[in-house]
Amino acid sequence: MRSVVLAAALAAGSAAYPAATPAQGDADAIGWLRAIYRATERLSYTGTFVYQHGEQVETSRITRIVDGSGVHERLEALDGTPREIVRVNEEVKCYLPQTMTLKIDRQLDTRPFPAMRADASELADRYAIRKGETERIAGYDCQAIVLEPRDNLRYGHKLWADLKTGMLVKAKTLNEKNEVVEQFAFTQLQIGGKIEKDQVKSRFAGKGRDWRIETAGVVAVDLTSLGWLLKSLPPGYRKVTEMRRSVGTRADVGHIVVSDGLAAVSVFIEPLSGQVRQGPGGLSRQGAVNVYTRTVDDHLVTVVGEVPAESVRLIADALEHRRP
């Protein structure tokens, strides 16, 4: 059954997209992708951005400092439910003042594109990559980079990077009809320069309030040794990270990250219990994010990603459990 679905998806992809010359892409455009990746890792910046998914629009302020002690970030929602996220290297703290909840987590893989390695040209196997127009955004002259998918198993993307630094200033995610399903754009931005450390400190920490603390334990683990295997992933996707998460009294949750080098998909594996019950399963969607759930050997499997519905379903179907 899985091979039939995969063949149908590939056939649909061939019909939906014009044939492209294989793998070469635009060398200059690929160079821009490398510049964006390097800039995201090394630059300090502060600014306000707007994020839109579906009909929801959110405005946030972010500050990031990269120095000799590592990476320090603070993200604050400026509308909607108050929330603040503070990151120091791998540790991430999420403050939810309305419920007086502090969630503490670890981010084992902090790269912006989880599977991207030194050779960004591998993306050209999965996307037709070209340079677009130049445009002024948030006071910066930016170069547009267009990534058109070569099949129906991934969304298209359009990225705008600052001409001088490579900083990603705007991004759009586009479906198979070339409709925008998700986008973000800075409306005010300072790249580099003097950014005070106080700007990456929580405004809630150390004020003596009684926060309810939820700490997630995150440990890198080989889930294959526990019998969980990903077989026959969709073309271009591969496993890049796997870990085990624990929160409070709930059973540990397995977490696998799958990526095609640009889009990331999370696979969560959680034992069914009184707290975790089997639902109807199947597909749901919010903006560019598709979610697919199924049960495998008394476990609830949830696959979440900014990829087409067919991709999350194929990734969910690829998961098998063999009792050790």
Where are these regions (language model features)?
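Intrinsically disordered, low-complexity linker/loop segments enriched in Gly/Pro
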Residues: 108-157
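N-terminal leader/targeting segments and the immediate start of mature chains
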Residues: 2-7, 11-71, 79-80, 122-128, ...
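An acidic-aromatic
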Residues: 58-59, 63-115, 170-193, 303
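Short, solvent-exposed coil/turn segments at beta-strand boundaries
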Residues: 40-42, 64-72, 86-91, 140, ...
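Short, solvent-exposed recognition patches
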Residues: 101, 209-299, 307-314
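A generic structural motif
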Residues: 108, 148, 174-175, 246, ...
